[in-house]
Design a protein with these regions (language model features):
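C-terminal beta-strand-loop-alpha-helix "lid" module of Rossmann-like NAD(P)-dependent dehydrogenases
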Residues: 1-293
Length: 293
């Protein structure tokens, strides 16, 4: 049985760890609220942009096909995945799930554009599909970072370096569940850009576009994709913080359980040592009394 001194040291060590896990829980909770507020502030703009682009698409000519819609006829398309992971660990299975999902869906010749230090390190020098000079952080998503990634993706697609670009991120299903998901960024799918029924605030009748629908589409399509990436980055960041909160809450509860068990063991050990000391004192006193007679 461990000594009372050793048990006390273990209890103090676990208490120190519990302070850290509890602090990380509070930090993640604060970051989650901030990220959600940030997304709520900008999402109306991007939602309106999606509505706008869906009203422009029907006015585009069938021929020639706009490059953003062009499905390249090739047996082996040059495919890339923009993958959103976290910069830090200690978030349960968050990073492992997204990497596993990526490998299950990717082919041998695909390319991985990984956002987040944890995912980058997991594939660096281990998977030749990783594009090593593509290096962006995932902490606290910003519009500028999403814009830079969008520009890189569009340039690679237009130049023919890539034929298809997919976005893999963690989607929040509900307050307790999040799952990896994949959406195609380029080429765009006309079927997913159909106009919604007009609401009270929408213009009536036909909308004229100057100088042309093609030119308008050229201007707003990158903003639409920018919104897709920023939304995915923000949702993934929220999912990461939620996963870390769950992991840290579980760790704190486990630490409490361990402390409770160790405290009982410490009390039993301490009680045993006190009982032994009392027994020795009584035995010594009895021996002294016997020697006096």
């Amino acid at each position: 049985m461990p000594s009372s001194k050793l048990l006390k040291e273990r209890i103090e060590s676990i208490q120190d760890t519990m302070k850290i896990t509890n602090a990380m829980y509070l930090i993640s909770s604060s970051k989650l609220r901030k990220a959600r507020k940030n997304y709520q502030n900008v999402s109306p703009y991007f939602n309106r942009m999606r509505d706008t682009i869906s009203r422009v698409v029907p006015h585009l000519p069938e021929e020639p096909v706009h490059p953003f819609f062009h499905e390249r006829d090739t047996a082996n398309p040059k495919r890339a995945y923009i993958v959103l992971t976290a910069d830090k660990g200690m978030a349960g299975a968050y990073n492992q799930n997204i990497i596993k999902f990526l490998k299950e869906n990717a082919d041998e010749n695909d390319r991985f554009y990984v956002i987040g230090q944890t995912g980058y390190r997991a594939l660096y020098h281990k998977d030749p599909r990783l594009v090593e000079d593509f290096h962006y952080g995932a902490t606290e998503p910003t519009l500028q970072r999403a814009r830079d990634i969008t520009v890189d993706a569009i340039d690679d697609f237009k130049s023919g370096k890539l034929d298809e670009i997919y976005l893999i991120y963690t989607r929040i299903e509900n307050a307790l569940t999040s799952e990896p998901t994949m959406v195609r960024l380029l080429p765009l799918d006309r079927a997913h850009l159909q106009p919604a029924p007009k609401g009270l605030g929408d213009p009536k009748g036909e909308v004229e576009m100057f100088p042309s629908a093609w030119t308008v589409f050229e201007q707003i399509a990158p903003i639409y994709m920018h919104g897709m990436i920023f939304g995915a980055m923000t949702e993934s960041f929220c999912a990461e913080q939620s996963a870390r909160m769950t992991a840290m809450d579980s760790a704190t509860k486990n630490a409490n359980d361990m402390i409770r068990e160790l405290q009982l063991e410490y009390n039993r050990t301490r009680q045993g040592s006190i009982t032994q000391e009392i027994t020795e004192i009584i035995g010594g006193a009895s021996a002294v009394q016997t020697s006096d007679y």
